[in-house]
Curated annotation (Swiss-Prot):
Protein name: UDP-3-O-acylglucosamine N-acyltransferase
Catalytic activity: a UDP-3-O-[(3R)-3-hydroxyacyl]-alpha-D-glucosamine + a (3R)-hydroxyacyl-[ACP] = a UDP-2-N,3-O-bis[(3R)-3-hydroxyacyl]-alpha-D-glucosamine + holo-[ACP] + H(+)
Species the sequence originates in: Christiangramia forsetii (strain DSM 17595 / CGMCC 1.15422 / KT0803)
SUPFAM superfamilies: Trimeric LpxA-like enzymes
Alphabetical keyword list: Acyltransferase, Lipid A biosynthesis, Lipid biosynthesis, Lipid metabolism, Repeat, Transferase
UniProt cross-references to Gene3D superfamilies, sorted A to Z: Hexapeptide repeat proteins (2.160.10.10), MurE/MurF, N-terminal domain (3.40.1390.10)
Name of the coding gene: lpxD
Family indicated by similarity: Belongs to the transferase hexapeptide repeat family. LpxD subfamily.
Length: 341
């Protein structure tokens, strides 16, 4: 699909400088732009590429002034980076604008779905499932009984949603995600064997949540495991039974959160963080990668290390840690002097 500079400017509320009929059919980085591509410039570090790019159209900030002739048509907007992000989203919507029901697939007679459904081949929809409008369900997705899904939700290939799970609107769930599998609940017996504790709760995913590939979110033992509105989860995260993730909290890959821990709003959690169970983590907390959390955390704390301590304390301690060989050498020299009298 092709767009002219004028059409793009209308979408972005921008102003064209150059050829208004310049056509583009793809997006590219400014240093790799070719004829027919659209790119953007927002970081001054890349300004030199504007004068060498072969891109047909380039989005720039409205206060940008060229210092020499350019071969690309400019579209001036208030915020070039944000405008390009808008186009990426628009492009993605066009690319993913599938509809219809492919065969073979299965929809239970008691299931209900809204307009604009796309159901890929070998997908399965169980009994009493409710699906909203404009939902895209890609091949090999499994949706168990009594699941409810809102509007404008995308489930990429291979997603598994166990029974009773509730998914809001504007949610994106990437390939390989498992929602609602049993939590890790086992009761030790007197002779060392384990008995399984039935997990009869569910999972609730609120609106505007994004879940990365391979992430697993276990159902609650009782009640609900909850991912609040706007949370962003990276790939390969393990969220255990009865965990609650607060609104607009972002968690990087390979983090594991043990059962019944509550995490507040607007937290940032780095990759490979381990969080013990039954903890309360406040709002706006920042946890650096590979940290180990074993205690409750107050609002606005910044932590690093395993076990995690305050970020500034960690940096001070690390300086001393790096100097340990030198410090030990000094101590040995002093010991020799003392022992030799």
């Amino acid at each position: 699909m092709k767009f002219t500079a004028t059409q793009i400017a209308e979408i972005l509320d921008g102003k064209v400088e150059g050829n208004p009929e310049a056509e583009v059919s793809e997006l590219a980085k400014i240093e790799e732009g070719s004829e027919g591509s659209l790119t953007f410039l927002s970081n001054p570090k890349y300004t030199s590429f504007l004068y060498t790019t072969n891109a047909s159209v380039t989005i720039v900030n409205d206060d940008f002034e060229v210092e020499q002739p350019v071969n690309t048509t400019l579209i001036k907007v208030k915020d070039a980076y944000k405008a390009f992000s808008t186009l990426l989203e628009y492009y993605n919507q066009i690319k993913l604008n599938k509809s219809g029901i492919e065969q073979p697939s299965h929809i239970s007679e008691s299931a209900k779905y809204g307009e604009g459904l796309y159901l890929g081949a070998f997908a399965y929809i169980g009994e009493n499932v409710s699906i909203g409008e404009n939902v895209k369900i890609y091949p090999n997705v499994y949706i168990g009984d009594n699941v409810k899904i809102g509007n404008n939700v995308t489930l990429f290939p291979g997603v598994k949603v166990y029974s009773e799970s509730l998914i809001g609107s504007e949610v994106t769930i990437h390939s390989g995600v498992v929602i609602g599998a049993d939590g890790f609940g086992f009761s030790p017996g007197d002779t060392g064997e384990y008995s399984k504790v039935p997990q009869i709760g569910n999972v609730i995913i609120e609106d505007y949540v994004d879940i990365g590939a391979g992430t697993t979110i276990d159902r609650a033992t009782l009640g609900s495991t909850i991912i609040r509105k706007g949370a962003k989860l990276d790939n390969h995260i393990q969220i255990a039974h009865n965990v609650e993730i607060g609104e607009n909290t972002a968690i990087a890959a390979q983090t594991g959160i043990a059962g019944s821990t509550k995490i507040g709003k607007n937290c940032l959690i780095g990759g490979q963080v381990g969080i013990a169970g039954h903890l309360t983590i406040g709002n706006r907390v920042k946890i650096q990668a590979q940290s180990g959390i074993g205690r409750d955390i107050k609002d606005d704390e910044m932590l690093q290390g395993s076990p995690a301590i305050g970020y500034s304390d960690y940096n001070k301690s690390y300086i001393h840690f790096k100097n340990l060989p030198k410090t030990m050498n000094i101590i040995h020299q002093l010991e020799k002097k003392i022992n030799n009298g």
